[in-house]
Amino acid sequence: VLRSLREKIKHCQTKDLYRFSKIIKSLQKTKLTGSKQKKQISELSELINASVSTSKSNRKLIPKSIHFPETLPVSLRAKEIRDSLRENQVLIVAGDTGSGKTTQLPKICLDAGYGVRGLIGHCQPRRLAATSVAARVADELNTKLGELVGYQVRFNDRFSENCRVKLMTDGILLAEIQSDPYLSKYEVVIVDEAHERSLNIDFILGYLKRLISKRDELKIIITSATIDVDKFSNHFNRAEVISVKGRMFPVETRYLPMNLASEEKEKTISEKVCDSVISLAREASKGISDAKDILVFLSSEREIREASRVLRKKKHKNLEILPLYARLPQSEQSRIFKEHTTLRVILSTNVAETSITVPKIKYVIDTGLARISRYSFQSKIQRLPIEKISQASANQRKGRCGRIEDGVCIRLYTEEDFKTRARYTDPEIIRTNLAAVILRMLSLNLGDIFKFPFLDKPESKSINEGFKLLAELKAVNEFRKLTKDGRRMALIPVDPKHAKMLLVANSKNCLKELLIIVSLLSIQDPRESGHVELNEADYESDLYNSKNSDFLALINLWIIFEETRKLGNSSRLKKFCRQYRLSYTRMREWKEVYFQLTLTCRRIGLRINKKPSNYADIHKSIIAGSLNQLAYRSTERQYIGSRNKKFIILNSSVLARALPKWVVTGELIETTQTFAAMAAKIDPVWIEEIGEHLVKREVHSPHWSVRTQSVKAFERVRLYGLTIIEKTRVEYSSVNQEHAHEIFLSEGLSKSAVKTDAAFYKQNQQILEAIRAEENKLRRPEKFISENDINAFYSKAIPENITSTKELENWIRDPESGASKKLILDRMALFDNNENPSTNEFPDSISLSSNQIPINYTFQPGAKKDGATVQIPLQLINQLSDADIDWAVPGIIREKCIALLKGLPKATRKKLIPISGFVDDIISEMFELRGDLFKLLATLLIKQRRINIAPVQFANISLPDHLIIKINVVDKNRKSLAIGSNVNEVKRLLSKKGIDFQR
């Protein structure tokens, strides 16, 4: 019975096949009693019969006789293709332009008996192609669209349960893989326009390569016009190839002659185009035909404007010049389809190569150049360099003429140049960031991406770059496994960067605003660029522009558009769009994307905020997906971004004049220079918050902070080479506790920079102040105790985990610490060999009229107050003499005498050599005699060496500050009134201030 059922499931629906096979295997292994087994087999049999019945019903939906137009070349090969499809799992159909492959292949599949057990899925790269092909196939099968043949594109579908052929974009098929990894509802999958090699197409081709080994009943058809059949065939295990000629008229190819190549190099592209157009215009005027227009392929909008300007200067009669590029308003694009009588010249980018078919083209002029999007792994920028096109692209351009009669293709390069070009354009997968592909593969559990069967395997650095971006977005962990955020991001059908923005917006309660922004970033910008340059006064975007952010301008535009929509009908909306140069179609698409993303976000548990959010949270959310798109202004207009990227902000941005210091931008684009079209002012502090997992922190300059009574350091925060925060204070103990402890001891305690009421500290400070005073007298800092000695003392006593005054006080309060005994300095133990400094030569005071006049000692070389200062009360100044001052500090007399004698003229000094020896000879006698130092020194010079020196000469000799005893006159509150170096000087200063000192 089970063998019979196994045979029967070959006729059931493909979506049921795996499930039924699994149940049969289970029943074969399970040992059940007769009644139970019979019951399960009976239930399974009913399910299989129902599925087979569905297949029979589906067969009735398909016309018994399917007509293939004889005028189409593929129709002549229909039987061959049908038979080959039955015999092979994978079939490659290389059909030239006009062969009819796109419309006839799904019909051939129906004719071969497919579409009964499952759908015939037909992938197209563009929505317009999917919908128009579906309508055409339905018409040829004499059915209404949505009955036998339907379509599904983003936000729109015409599809019913009875549909056996499903046209769709490749993005739709990818989305279905998410929920149906085996594509079980499909019996045939057709991948059309495979030559375009977009990311989606390459991923689908790799996925199908794996899938065919798991579903041997699945049929795959790969088709395109310009396709490398050998590469595709080998990829699918030497798949069968059928080539079909196109329904084209002969096309004459004219190359730039070699002898003119060097001469033509001197001309600009616009001049070359102009010469060719004028020549062809003359040729066209001689004949009568339906096709006479000229299609010119140029590399950029700028080249189109320049060529248009040069052509208009020629003022050629009956020559209509039309531009064509993606950003051109739809109303201007549609002009190429309107009837006309004049000779028409269409100046186009490569949009006319595949996306748009321009009618009635007799001539093609190919410059051989195009902007090719390439991702730079070094700068992390999507570049748009102008490059030579491939041979396949050149032939695709050539195929734009010769469709309704003979054509001419003029190539503005030599035949030799053409032969040396690459055969095919590099696929998108090797010239873009792979983050989105990797995220999708991880979510589908497709295993090691390095082993995935891509048609062209990306380089390892490309894959690693994709993983780096996902790590930046926190979508993968250090093991390259999906995080919780990564799994949710994979469910949101937008770029991973934009998905990250939405997740962060959810946490910051600004999801509604970010849905508006991300929805627009996911489509082509609806704000149109006309062919004619606009004056700023003519441009009315100020209605919705924001002062500081292009992203907020999008929200403002959305609000205004919604208000207009609610107030009026579609005609009013269209008028609004024309007024503000907006594409009505893209504005509707924006709304549809917003609606779909909103549903997705709700489905995965995100909450849409009802109240408006704030500027900071909105832009923090944008930063979360744009951590590689941050920059600061370095010059008047130039910005420097991560990894030293230099760029400017376009004039179309609201920041073009404001140019704030820090910005977050949309994607940077590199053409002849790098620019940002969208930007917003930000606070760099937001970057640190959002990019916390990526920033590099450099802690430097650790120091003791008297204000906080702890060890602080400065932190520099960087992201991808950008210094976000130059200098912010941090607690150094959290960075390096051991070093912080050392600084606490050396710069805090040892330098007496600690503020505490602890008893040990007060006692130690008194001891240290007394010792420092003695050292200052002797002018020998650290003679008795150095900072190193103090540091060593505290280091032994204080635990290593203490780095601040607060921690020290907490430790002291602990009764088990024993701190009170450990922390008190022993004064006598500090002096070398118990040497106590003598105070005889450096007294603390002098006696004057039974009063003790204090002497202060300062050791500050170079400062005026360096040395000893006598603090004399105002009422005693008249009792003070210069002799009292001269002998107030006996310890400096010898050094002062030596300095005075060294200040004498050279001839005199020679008689005293050695001067120090002479002073030693007279010093004891000086101490016996005392009195005015200058007079005493002069007297002893005559007596000992017969040298006659007037005492006044010594008064004119400049002495070091520390050898001059200062007089500081103070009032009863110890406030300084006058400071001088002798009695007469201070009296003069007092008189000058009007202070009475005679009483």
Over which residues does each language-model region extend?
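Generic recognition of stable, solvent-exposed alpha-helical segments in well-folded globular domains
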Residues: 80, 100, 104, 128, ...
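A positional "C-terminalness" feature that preferentially activates on distal terminal regions of long
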Residues: 600-633, 652, 690-692, 699-703, ...
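Short acidic-hydrophobic surface loop/beta-edge motif
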Residues: 155, 241-244, 636-642, 842-850, ...
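Extended active-site and interfacial segments that coordinate phosphate-rich ligands
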Residues: 180-195, 367-375, 379-380, 384, ...
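Extended hydrophobic-aromatic, low-complexity segments
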Residues: 93, 478-479, 649, 879-882
